[in-house]
Swiss-Prot record:
The keyword rRNA-binding applies. PANTHER family: RIBOSOMAL PROTEIN S15, BACTERIAL AND ORGANELLAR (PTHR23321), SMALL RIBOSOMAL SUBUNIT PROTEIN US15M (PTHR23321:SF26). GO terms for molecular function: rRNA binding; structural constituent of ribosome. It comes from Wolbachia pipientis wMel. GO terms for cellular component: cytosolic small ribosomal subunit. Part of the 30S ribosomal subunit. Forms a bridge to the 50S subunit in the 70S ribosome, contacting the 23S rRNA. One of the primary rRNA binding proteins, it binds directly to 16S rRNA where it helps nucleate assembly of the platform of the 30S subunit by binding and bridging several RNA helices of the 16S rRNA. The keyword Ribosomal protein applies. Belongs to the universal ribosomal protein uS15 family. This is Small ribosomal subunit protein uS15. Keywords: Ribonucleoprotein, Ribosomal protein, RNA-binding, rRNA-binding. GO terms for biological process: translation.
Amino acid sequence: MSITSEKKKSLMNIYAIKEDDTGSSFVQCAILTERISNLTEHFKVHKHDHHSKRGLLILIGRRRKHLNYIKRKFGNEAYQELIEKLGIRK
């Protein structure tokens, strides 16, 4: 269910604002989105895993907070661009 360090590094390279950017909200949203998609695939097989479902809801809440921060700090344009890149929402 967790993502590999190679996958994290590739996400960091794609969504980083500057070189060696590991903690920006853009990178964290990308990593959280990957974890959420992995858990979603897990639930297609294990429908009754309620313990992990709580973890999924926590991850979704964290991503929502980062997205709100991006929208507030960097503007609606950066927010919409990130959502399109990640493939979430409308």
